[in-house]
Each structure stands twice: as C-alpha cells, then as structure tokens.
C-alpha cells in the first residue's frame, strides 16, 4: 500500500476482532511513529504507553467515563457521556497513549495510524478519555511520566468491520497573493 492509498482508505475503526495484536507488530508500528515524523521540538520528547487486554482496557474506559460524568459541565460536546452502551475504547484489544508536546504527538499519532492501516490493523483516535488521562492519579497508574502530557489515545486492533467513507467536503483554500 502506498501512502496516498493509506491516507484515502484509512477509517476510524469502532468495532474490533477479539484477536490479540502481537507485541512485535505493535513495536514496529510504534517504531514507525517515533522515528519517521520530523520532531517539532528538534528532539524525541515522547513516550508510548501500551495497554493490552479488552477487559482491562474496558475497565479503564469505565473509569474515564465516570470521571467525565462526575467532573465536567453539561453541554452538547459532552453528550457522548450519556449514550447508551458507549464504550470509551470501542472494545479495542490495545490502546497506545502518546505523551509529550502536542505538535510532536499529533505527528506521531497520524503516522501510527497510517502504519497500522498499512499492516491490516484498525485504529481510532479517541478524545473522550483525555482529561481523565491527564490527572496525576491516572498518569501514575498508567506509568505516564509526570512531566509529560497525554495527547493521543489510539485504539488498535484487527477490524471486525470497516465502515464506508463518509461524504467529504472540499476544504476551504484561501490563496494569499
């Protein structure tokens, strides 16, 4: 698969096979994400924390959901908290958390998703647990270095289903002459 195919065919996967992902494969994808994007800060300032096991990850997701319900004001951006059957990590067998400077983690996260897709794996970048992930107690529990900020929470696994591409709008392009 070439990079253009990967960009146009990658989908956010929200339904995963229970088949575990091999650690060697996870490490290869992390290597791609850590070594290939140019670092914004001129160094390699991030960490990758890997969670494995559907039940264990679901328990962390329930903690994140409880934190969101207990700690945040109501509003349309928080409607996901009350959706029946909502799962923070979508039943994924692996979640990778990238922590560090925002610019670097976003580059690493996108590269991670494309590398996984090229290897037949599905991903979904989830934003719902981010405030929970940034609490001192959660960072300690997940062994995220205290001085780093979690930026990317990426579900990873073999897709059970692959959704169709949604309709896309043309981007707003402003030529400055």
Language model features by range: what are they?
Residues 1-91, 177:
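N-terminal amphipathic, basic helical "cap/leader" segment at the start of enzyme domains
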Residues 6-9, 25, 82-83, 150-177:
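C-terminal helix-cap and adjacent tail motif
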Residues 33-34, 96-141:
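Small-aliphatic-rich amphipathic alpha-helix that forms the alpha element of a beta-alpha
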Residues 41-43, 107, 165-167:
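Short glycine/proline-enriched turns and hinge-like loops at secondary-structure junctions
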Residues 52, 98-100, 156-158:
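Short beta-strand-to-loop capping motifs
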Residues 67, 140-144:
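Short, hinge-like loop/turn segments at secondary-structure boundaries
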Residues 91-94, 121, 146-150:
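Short coil/turn connectors at secondary-structure junctions
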